[in-house]
Amino acid sequence: MADPVTVITTIYNGSRFIDGFARNLVQTLRAQDRAILLDDGSNPPLVLPEILRSDARIKLITAKRLGRGAALNLAIGNCKTGLIAIQDIDDLSLPGRLAAQADFLAARPDALSFTPAQSDWPIIRRKGSRQIAPSRLYVSNPFHHSSLAFHRDIWVGAGGYDTNLPCCIDLDFYLRAACRAGASFWQLDTPFIARNLDPAERFYAAIPSDIYRATLQTVLDRYRADVGFSHWMILAMMRTKLGIARGTRG
């Protein structure tokens, strides 16, 4: 039997998405997989639909408001499997995602494994899995955090997610995992997620731009020396001088 995966979803006032998410989660999980849903202080508290309440593979943890980084750490800390997959409540996993990423991580246990989304431009979808250097993230973030899968040992080695950042939590974790746990970044060639692209429905779209820019700079500066100099760093500096906005992903 292929290695089991635990799907981690943190939820804050996301009950409007729960029915669609529930149907998708049940379709996504294989017999050996598990899911931990962490209600991060929703008001009112999240109530699972019957399709999830009756599924022994799925666990709900209800917590006070922690913030996404601490909520992810609490959920992952409760995992019993060696493999973790992240999925937002408003995004959908596509058939075969967990099997594909579990197989990839069996061959590359040091990897953070990402996939494209259905909505990505075809030009950025390449045949075959490709490794992406950590310094590439200094130009833009090419990854969807809802597509991430990794070995739990990477999370342990990285020291978990940062619990104090107002945003850029995922970017920080990627660079933290590379610099502290020796993780490599890999993008599979098959789209395995469908994203919610409505900015009005995405929590971090409401972060004020000045807070985002300041936090982004803090995160990039935090790991710059460990990531090392490369042509990506040169390109990032050129874009900054030319006033070109940095690309981002969820």
Annotate each PLM feature.
Residues 194-198, 203-231:
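Catalytic core of nucleotide-sugar-dependent glycosyltransferases
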Residues 63-79:
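Glycine-rich, basic loop-to-helix element that forms the pyrophosphate-binding segment
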Residues 39-48, 88-91:
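A conserved acidic beta->alpha catalytic loop
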Residues 96-125:
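Conserved donor NDP-sugar-binding/catalytic core segment of glycosyltransferases
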Residues 84:
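Short aromatic/hydrophobic "clamp" motif used to bind/position activated sugar donors
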Residues 167-173:
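Acidic donor-binding loop at a coil-to-helix junction in glycosyltransferase catalytic cores
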Residues 116, 185-192:
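Catalytic beta-strand/loop signature of glycosyltransferases that borders the donor
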Residues 23-32:
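Short, acidic, metal-binding catalytic loop of nucleotide-sugar glycosyltransferases
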